[in-house]
UniProtKB/Swiss-Prot annotation:
InterPro entries linked to this entry: UDP_glucos_trans, UDP_glycos_trans_CS
pH-linked activity: Optimum pH is 6.0-7.3.
Keyword Transferase tagged: yes
Family: Belongs to the UDP-glycosyltransferase family.
Role this protein plays: Glucosyltransferase involved in the catabolism of abscisic acid (ABA). No activity with (-)-phaseic acid (PA), methylated-ABA or with other hormones such as jasmonate, zeatin, auxin (IAA) or gibberellin A3 (GA3).
Cysteines paired by S-S bonds: none
Record keywords: Glycosyltransferase, Transferase
EC number(s) recorded for this UniProt protein: 2.4.1.263
Name the record gives this protein: Abscisate beta-glucosyltransferase
Binding site for an anthocyanidin: 20, 380
Record-level Gene Ontology MF annotations: abscisic acid glucosyltransferase activity
Catalytic activity: 2-cis-(+)-abscisate + UDP-alpha-D-glucose = beta-D-glucopyranosyl cis-(+)-abscisate + UDP
Length: 478
């Protein structure tokens, strides 16, 4: 690739958590591939996590770099997720913006304190929201609903003012939607950040949720650029393996195991980087997977232990006795602990289905790989994503969880092994319904790939934002 001459300078300021950090790094790389000078604002702790892929991009001539802010956020604090206070980065950010004055800064929604300093310096600020058009529309239309007609948390209600007939329950909603009058200050801060922004970058693509993309673009007071799936910037095996952080599993062992399986024969199960399932839920998943008699690869991340228990993932009684040995002997299953190269796994020819927590990154990665899903939402906007997958796109089946899980709270809503087995069989065993889900999933995957190519809708939106920033620069200079 020849060296690109930068057209505009854009700063990308990701949040420290993996689920928010990874897609914004991908977005920065995507904009760099369009000729925008992209600078990623990182901390001493986060810079090493993506230094290798940025160095590779630089060798290919892309105008991309990392600026490490002088302050840091302690890694031990990242476990509190979206509630982590990152305002220690405010002064280093202010000094950098005074020195460099980029044409635009893309800010993660969780840096809710950043709005004032960017606004004060007159730099256009674009919000990176991290969820899709459908979920944004659901949230916006539920934000001012009092739910007066609902008598219990389990009673269904119709989501108003959206193109599809979608029912939800109070138990599937985060607290700030259940009780809009009691919105915490942090959520109000994020809403204010959105309202004062120049526009919003959305990691999705038009053909995935066209009615909702149109709704956002026509009704939002600010501008929206739909630029995904940004994960397509990861072309090489190295990019996919090292995305986010180095895998903590034996990558080659994982790929060798998958290579030994027939095409379209394996279920991939993973619940993301932050979800912490308790041992009793892990056991039910294990029993359900075994009873389904389907081949699977299961990545177990963090475990929600009682305070008195050993907290090492490799210890404790969190799998049925003899389970892993039986899976090894029969060749039916592979259990992995820690961080796995999800893009590589999902794109492998052996993968037939994906059991997922419906985080937006995982949802888009499953969509892009053309893999139908078993949906197991836990928190955030994941129940809305489940509705998109199973009721709008019709490319998945629900496992049956009905309880929204408050962050770091006691686990609720245990899903039994029978429901796990039924969902796995429904997705993995050949049937007219399963075949139709796979056909739709493959069709959508093709549209995802075309969206980021020249002539695609996401490609056009990236170009449109760059051109708008160029026009603003010319107007200011004139």
């Amino acid at each position: 690739m020849k060296t690109l001459t930068p057209s505009v300078e854009i700063f990308f300021f990701p949040y420290v958590g993996g689920g928010h950090q990874i897609p914004m790094i991908d977005a920065a790389r995507m904009f760099a591939s369009h000729g925008a000078s992209s600078t990623i604002l990182a901390t001493p702790s986060t810079t090493p996590l993506f230094q290798k892929c940025i160095t590779r991009d630089q060798k290919f001539g892309l105008p991309i770099s990392i600026h490490t802010l002088s302050a840091d956020v302690p890694q031990s604090d990242i476990s509190v997720g979206p509630f982590l206070d990152t305002s220690a980065l405010l002064e280093p950010l202010r000094q950098l913006l005074l020195q460099r004055r980029p044409h635009c800064i893309v800010v993660d929604m969780f840096h809710r304190w950043s709005g004032d300093v960017v606004y004060e310096l007159g730099i256009p600020r674009t919000l990176f929201n991290g969820i899709g058009c459908f979920a944004l529309c659901v949230q916006e239309n539920l934000r001012h609903v009092a739910f007066k007609s609902v008598s219990t948390d389990s009673e269904p209600f119709l989501v108003p003012n959206i193109p599809d007939r979608i029912e939800m329950t109070m138990s599937q909603l985060p607290p700030f939607l259940r009780n809009p009058s009691g919105i915490p200050e942090r959520w109000r801060g994020m809403k204010q950040l959105e309202e004062k922004s120049f526009g919003t970058l959305i990691n999705s693509f038009y053909d995935l949720e066209p009615a909702y993309a149109d709704l956002i673009k026509s009704k939002w007071g600010n501008k929206a650029w739909i630029v995904g799936p940004v994960s397509f910037c990861n072309r090489s095996k190295e990019d996919k393996t090292e995305r986010g952080k180095p895998p903590t599993i034996d990558e080659q062992n994982c790929l060798n195991w998958l290579n030994s399986k027939k095409p379209s024969s394996v279920l991939y199960a993973s619940f993301g980087s932050l979800a912490r399932l308790p041992p009793e839920q892990l056991k039910e998943i294990a029993y359900g997977l075994e009873a389904s008699e389907q081949s699977f690869i299961w990545v177990v991340g963090n475990i929600l232990h009682n305070p008195s228990e050993n907290k090492e993932n490799g210890s404790g009684n969190w799998l049925p006795e003899g389970f892993e040995q039986r899976m090894k002997e029969t060749g039916k299953g592979l259990v992995l602990r820690g961080w796995a190269p999800q893009l590589l796994i999902l794109e492998h020819a052996a993968i037939k289905g994906f059991m997922t927590h419906c985080g937006w990154n995982s949802t888009l990665e499953g969509v892009s790989a053309g893999v139908p899903m078993i949906t197991w939402p836990l928190t955030a906007e994941q129940f809305s994503n489940e509705k998109l997958i199973t009721e709008v796109l019709k490319t998945g089946v629900q496992v049956g969880n009905r309880e929204w899980w408050p962050w770091n709270a006691e686990w609720k809503g245990l899903v039994g092994r029978e429901k796990v087995e039924v969902a796995v069989r429904k997705l993995m065993v050949e049937s007219v319904e399963a075949d139709e889900m796979r056909r739709r999933a493959k069709d959508i995957a093709g549209k995802a790939a075309r969206a980021v190519e020249e002539g695609g809708t996401s490609y056009a939106d990236v170009e449109a934002l760059i051109q708008e920033l160029q026009a603003r620069t010319c107007a200011n200079q004139g």
